[in-house]
A protein has these predicted regions:
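Conserved residues at beta->alpha junctions
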Residues: 17, 126, 183
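Short, well-structured alpha-helical patches and their helix-loop capping segments
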Residues: 95, 99, 123-124, 144, ...
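Glycine-rich nucleophile elbow surrounding the catalytic serine of serine-hydrolase chemistry
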Residues: 124-134
Length: 193
């Protein structure tokens, strides 16, 4: 009996990480599994329908269509746009949720009967709360809710990217734009040259 299938007889919790998730690598993994990639692509397509009323606004930020190739051909990456600078959140927020959904589906294929032995708890750190909600929807078999959660992830990402661009937030190497600092004076946050 594998560790994953042993969870069918044991209480367990599901936890979902936030922005520090190496989401591009995780999305690449699921993109090369045709079965998982097709399911996640279906959720993304369903989210397109949810977002149709705001499609034009998303197009002004170049995120009306996510640059995700699911499934991806052998040797190719899932995310067809390079690191996007201030627009990275428009890709990373939904990209993380897509990777988390793919991981959940992979757990079921590895032997976890998530329908008959559901998690005793769900926890999400930061944007991991979106992972919690898409997991709950998926476990309940509510594909429409899963699409709505994914659409929300896309809107949050687009909004974060827009605010980052408007604020002309400086980029520091590989550091993320998704940082919130409170209670610290501007003088401490301003680079001194």
């Amino acid at each position: 009996m594998s560790f994953v299938s042993s969870l069918n007889e044991t209480p367990y919790a599901l936890t979902f990480a936030g922005q520090a998730t190496p989401w591009r690598a995780a999305l690449d993994e699921i993109a090369h599994d045709p079965e998982i990639a097709a399911i996640v692509a279906g959720v993304i397509e369903a989210s397109d329908k949810v977002l149709s009323p705001v499609r034009r606004s998303l197009a002004t930020q170049s995120v009306s269509v996510l640059p995700f190739t699911l499934p991806a051909p052998d040797g190719e990456v899932a995310v067809t746009r390079e690191v996007a600078g201030p627009d990275e959140a428009a890709l990373s927020v939904p990209g993380i949720v897509a990777a988390q959904l793919g991981a959940l589906i992979d757990l079921t294929r590895a032997g976890l009967n998530i329908m008959s032995n559901q998690p005793t708890a769900f926890e999400g750190h930061s944007q991991g709360v979106l992972g919690v909600e898409i997991a709950r929807a998926w476990i309940a078999g509510d594909e429409a809710r899963a699409a709505s959660v994914f659409a929300l992830a896309r809107l949050i990402g687009a909004a974060a990217a827009r605010v980052t661009r408007r604020a002309r937030a400086p980029h520091a190497g590989d550091a993320t734009y998704m940082v919130s600092v409170r209670g610290v004076s501007d003088a401490l946050l301003t680079p001194h040259h």
